[in-house]
UniProtKB/Swiss-Prot annotation:
This is Exodeoxyribonuclease 7 large subunit. Keywords: Cytoplasm, Exonuclease, Hydrolase, Nuclease. It catalyses: Exonucleolytic cleavage in either 5'- to 3'- or 3'- to 5'-direction to yield nucleoside 5'-phosphates. The gene is xseA. Heterooligomer composed of large and small subunits. InterPro entries: Exonuc_VII_L (IPR003753), Exonuc_VII_lsu_C (IPR020579), OB-fold_nuc-bd_dom (IPR025824). Belongs to the XseA family. It is found in: Cytoplasm. It comes from Alcanivorax borkumensis (strain ATCC 700651 / DSM 11573 / NCIMB 13689 / SK2).
Length: 448
């Protein structure tokens, strides 16, 4: 407190500041109950009012950052319970309270009743997370349990129409406020379960006071919601409001509009996901096609056709024939080399008779010596001709030319009916083309 004297008197501002500090330090937060009067809401968003009883009154203020959290609209003449601090408005020297919280008088008893019932149901495991069901990603039909004439149903339908207009919505009407509301809400929920028409349900209403929302704190309704076999979203009041059905439901939404968003797929997001999946599918198909084409190319390079096999066999036969001719020529050259010394020795003999005999013998030897070689050559030529004929006879193309055919299932030749079943596609190769056929019936020959 500022010290003053006649020589140094206090200013009015300083006095009010000292009084404000004294009040705020002397009184903690207090609870007051009284009747609202002179209630005003200027453009600033702050509230100003008087709080009175039968014998006195006090001015009060509740600033915008606090009053925006309330779930009811105060009116003149209402009995309210406030939590406030005592202060002094320095510019005018007005003694007043600054309210931090306000609720209708009598709400405290309801709150205590709510807390007790919540604790009981929670102890029974009614709100356990393991009992919660997952909402369907794409429901075939959505059910809404609420008043058919309230703001909540309009908000829900507006959101559903925007996000997924193709999904039908079924409304189960019920009162959401008053003495009849709990029973009607239970009946509507029981009807939705009995008819089993919807894949997901929304239970909710717009905002209001604790008394207005009390129907959603009904014990029977909370138990019915917890035991509902259909996934259910509770959307009672605004974000600051909480009812027992919010804890019992599979999911709580802060507002009815938010509940509609939770139960409905967003078509724009679904379209984006489908487009992404389509691109992914095309990429995978292209990769698979390239893999198959590469395998086919590799297999086609390894596959040897009958014509290629015959050409390679003919080339091998030509090589063998050339080798045989070279061997025969080499043998003949060797024999001629062996004959030449004999001719030289014969030329050195002088008697005419010996010369004639030797010439005759030489002529005889000259005729006899090539005969084994010629016979061996003829035998090898005959053997070569036989091999060529056998190779030509064994050629698949020659077999086809004689009127036969070869049937394939895929790349495998069909040798038995046990390889086939009805519906198989076969390729039959003839000498001048192919036939594509499908198996209609398979009959095994009776070999007994």
């Amino acid at each position: 407190m500022t010290i003053s004297s006649r020589a140094e008197p206090l200013s009015i501002s300083q006095l009010n500041l000292d009084a404000q500090g004294l009040l705020e330090s002397s009184f903690p937060l207090i609870w007051l109950q009284g009747e609202l009067s002179n209630f005003s809401r200027p453009a600033s968003g702050h509230w100003y009012f008087s709080l009175k009883d039968t014998r006195a009154q006090i001015n009060g203020a509740m600033f915008r950052n606090r009053n925006r959290l309330l779930n009811f609209a105060p009116q003149n003449g209402e009995q309210v319970l406030v939590r406030a601090k005592i202060t002094l408005y320095v510019p005018r020297g007005n003694f007043q309270i600054v309210v931090e919280h306000m609720e209708p008088a009598g709400q405290g008893a309801l709150k205590a009743q709510f807390d007790a019932l919540k604790a009981q149901l929670q102890s029974e495991g009614l709100f356990a997370q393991e009992h919660k069901r997952t909402l369907p990603a794409w429901p075939n039909q959505i059910g809404v349990i609420t008043s058919p004439s309230g703001a909540a149903i309009r908000d829900i339908l507006q959101v559903l129409q925007r996000r997924c207009p193709s999904i039908p919505v079924l409304i189960y009407p019920a009162a959401v406020q008053g003495a009849e509301a709990p029973a009607q809400l239970r009946q509507a929920l029981a009807l939705a379960v009995a008819r089993n028409e919807c894949d997901v349900l929304i239970l909710g209403r717009g905002g209001g006071s604790l008394e207005d929302l009390w129907a959603f704190n009904d014990e029977g309704l909370a138990r019915a919601v917890a035991n509902c076999p259909i996934p259910i979203v509770s959307a009672v009041g605004h974000e600051v409001d909480t009812g027992l059905t919010d804890f019992a439901a599979d999911l709580r939404a802060p507002t009815p509009s938010a509940a509609a968003e939770l139960v409905s797929p967003d078509l724009s997001i679904v379209s984006q996901r489908l487009a992404g999946l389509h691109r992914r599918l095309r990429w995978v198909m292209a990769q698979e096609l390239r893999t198959v084409q590469e395998r086919l190319r590799h297999l086609s390079q390894r596959l040897r056709s009958p014509r290629q096999h015959l050409e390679q066999s003919s080339q091998r036969l030509d090589e063998l024939q050339n080798r045989l001719q070279r061997q025969m020529q080499h043998r003949l050259t060797l024999l001629q080399g062996r004959l030449q010394p004999s001719q030289q020795r014969l030329a050195r003999l002088s008697p005419q008779r010996l010369l004639v005999e030797r010439q005759q013998r030489l002529a005889t030897l000259s005729k006899r010596l090539p005969q084994p070689i010629l016979r061996q050559l003829q035998q090898q030529q005959l053997q070569l001709a036989g091999l060529s004929k056998r190779l030509h006879t064994a050629s698949p193309l020659e077999t086809l030319a004689r009127g036969y055919s070869i049937t394939f299932k895929g790349n495998q030749a069909v040798r038995s009916v046990e390889q086939l079943q009805a519906g198989d596609t076969l390729t039959t190769r003839l000498a001048d083309g192919e036939i594509i056929a499908r198996v209609e019936h398979v009959q095994v020959s009776d070999t007994d």
